[in-house]
């Protein structure tokens, strides 16, 4: 997805960032094949951010991202978060992701945490 946005508008976490203690990372496998992944980043005791949601091209439109996101929503509730937010791209390639998030109750919002307005970004949030 980095190829769709200029460097200053790319907010994906690298491997070192995924290892930080405020990040929980999940992956979905079918035997030895990676189907998808996603992360939850704690922003504070009540607010977390969905990060690094990806689905393998081979497994697109099979419900992998939805199942993973539903798991992350349940985990966020279990941890006591009252709000989840996310940043995704504004380009057409991100429309399926935006539909998925909207279908699970996320609504568009302004920038949160350290984000700023960006024509390449769409911000969404959900009260839990």
PLM feature spans:
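Acetyl-CoA-dependent GNAT
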Residues: 1-47, 51, 56, 69-70, ...
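Conserved acetyl-CoA-binding loop-helix of GNAT-fold acetyltransferases
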Residues: 55, 61-78, 99-103
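Residue-level recognition of the GNAT/N-acetyltransferase active site
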Residues: 56, 89-91
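Conserved active-site alpha-helix within GNAT-family acetyltransferase domains
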Residues: 66, 91-110, 117-119
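Terminal substrate-recognition subdomain of acyl/acetyltransferases
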Residues: 88, 113-114, 118-128
